[in-house]
């Protein structure tokens, strides 16, 4: 009613007309005739099967198998005829509406007359003609609205009355529906399992598709999907915990095997058994005895002929104020186990007139404890050994001799050959060492061989 008559008249006049509806109705009618003919032929064939030699159980099953298809042909023929009739009804309604609808020409003439009357309305002489013309336009307005309403009602009824055509049923033996039902159930279960697995793999996609069905905006849909995903994670995690408790007994043997493997690895990292009693016998306070347990310095033999022998230099250990430190860096082990290194003054020094005597060297090499060294020195003083024209110094393991500050420390260069990797499995680091070995010094009376002391041994003054 609110739409002007020009709109309704223009839509009906500009349409394709009833020709397409009538052609479609004719096609549906021909299709109905074909279905009816096929139904009649199949019914005749089934009757001949039952009346001829095809009798018994096979003929009965044959007729029963074609029964659903025969019924479908008959029903489809009826539906096609009804559809054709509805097309004809819609075409008739269109023709009736087009005939009852004011034409665009009539509406245009009414507007033209109204314009002329308004233009020539001097002193109100055209008041009555203008009112009559407007009343005629109102009539056409109401007529167009009623015509379009009636046409819409008939068209909607015809559309609703058109039956839907079902697909043709398969021709199968009686009882095949039950097997198909079981297959459908199995297929439905498999599809359900696949949907569940897909949902677990990507729940966000399913939440997004679910909220998109409600017509929300993309932003609102994304927010709702994220909220649903958080709730899903919060509710699903307890199931993960329960599954972990159920599967824990199956993982216990694996954890036990890993624990035993770690214990075996720890045993492989232990030092050799032969070095443990040595370290225990030496005690925690014996630094040089501990060095024996870590590294063994190979002995060198003196080269005959009076020339200084060549030996592989050992790395020099850094000085340490704590003698009993168990973490001392690798150094040169002393020749006698259990004996601390002698003082700096016991070796050959630059600026002295003569070296120490061979007796001093032998006394130093044979001393096993500081008490024996002091007893030996006391015995020498009591025996009245004459003092020569140069100073004698006696080797003492616990001697406290002040080193001369003006005498520089001997500068010994490292050899070209190292001592190799020290310690078990090469665990002890190697550093550059000073020269070490035995030297032979000549004097006016004797020629003695004395050991060279490492430059890393500190004096009491430095300590």
From Swiss-Prot:
The keyword Iron does not apply. It is found in: Cell membrane. Keywords: Cell membrane, Membrane, Transmembrane, Transmembrane helix. GO terms for cellular component: plasma membrane. The keyword Cell membrane applies. Residues 303-322 are annotated as: Disordered. It is a multi-pass membrane protein. InterPro entries: PPE-PPW_C, PPE_dom, PPE_sf. Residues 306-316 have a biased composition (Pro residues). It comes from the Bacteria. The chain crosses the membrane at residues 3-23, 88-108, 112-132, 216-236, 245-265, 276-296, 323-343, 419-439. GO terms for biological process: response to host immune response. Belongs to the mycobacterial PPE family. This is Uncharacterized PPE family protein PPE1. It comes from Mycobacterium tuberculosis (strain CDC 1551 / Oshkosh). The gene is PPE1.
């Amino acid at each position: 009613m609110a739409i002007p008559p020009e709109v309704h008249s223009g839509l009906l006049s500009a349409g394709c007309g009833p020709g397409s509806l009538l052609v479609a109705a004719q096609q549906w009618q021909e299709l109905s005739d074909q279905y009816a003919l096929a139904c009649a032929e199949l019914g005749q064939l089934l009757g001949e099967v039952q009346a001829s030699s095809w009798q018994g159980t096979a003929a009965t099953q044959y007729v029963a198998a074609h029964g659903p298809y025969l019924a479908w042909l008959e029903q489809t023929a009826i539906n096609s005829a009804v559809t054709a009739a509805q097309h004809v009804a819609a075409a008739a309604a269109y023709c009736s509406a087009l005939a009852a609808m004011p034409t665009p020409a009539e509406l245009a003439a009414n507007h033209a007359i109204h314009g002329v009357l308004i233009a020539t309305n001097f002193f109100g002489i055209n008041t009555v003609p203008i009112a009559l013309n407007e009343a005629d336009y109102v009539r056409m307005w109401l007529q167009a609205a009623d015509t379009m309403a009636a046409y819409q009602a008939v068209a909607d009824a015809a559309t609703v009355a058109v039956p839907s055509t079902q697909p043709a049923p398969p021709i199968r033996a009686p009882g095949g529906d039950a097997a198909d039902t079981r297959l459908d159930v199995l297929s439905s279960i498999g599809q359900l399992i696949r949907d569940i697995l897909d949902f677990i793999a990507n729940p966000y996609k399913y939440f997004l598709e679910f909220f998109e069905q409600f017509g929300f905006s993309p932003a609102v849909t994304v927010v709702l999907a994220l909220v649903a995903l958080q709730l899903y994670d919060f509710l699903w995690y307890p199931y993960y915990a329960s599954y972990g408790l159920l599967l824990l007994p199956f993982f216990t043997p694996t954890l036990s095997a890993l624990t035993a493997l770690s214990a075996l690895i720890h045993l492989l990292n232990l030092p050799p058994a032969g070095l443990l009693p040595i370290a225990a016998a030496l005690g925690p306070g014996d630094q040089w005895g501990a060095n024996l347990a870590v590294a063994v310095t190979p002995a060198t033999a003196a080269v005959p002929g009076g020339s200084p022998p060549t030996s592989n230099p050992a790395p020099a250990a850094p000085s340490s104020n704590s003698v009993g430190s168990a973490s001392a860096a690798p150094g040169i082990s002393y020749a006698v186990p259990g004996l601390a290194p002698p003082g700096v003054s016991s070796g050959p020094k630059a600026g002295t007139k003569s070296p120490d005597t061979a007796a001093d060297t032998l006394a130093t090499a044979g001393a096993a404890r500081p008490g024996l060294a002091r007893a030996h020195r006391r015995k020498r003083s009591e025996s009245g050994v004459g003092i020569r024209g140069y100073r004698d110094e006696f080797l003492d393991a616990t001697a406290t001799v002040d080193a001369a500050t003006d005498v520089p420390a001997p500068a010994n260069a490292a050899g070209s050959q190292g001592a190799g990797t020290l310690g078990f499995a090469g665990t002890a680091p190697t550093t550059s060492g000073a020269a070490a070995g035995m030297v032979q010094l000549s004097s006016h009376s004797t020629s003695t061989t004395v050991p060279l002391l490492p430059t890393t041994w500190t004096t009491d003054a430095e300590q």
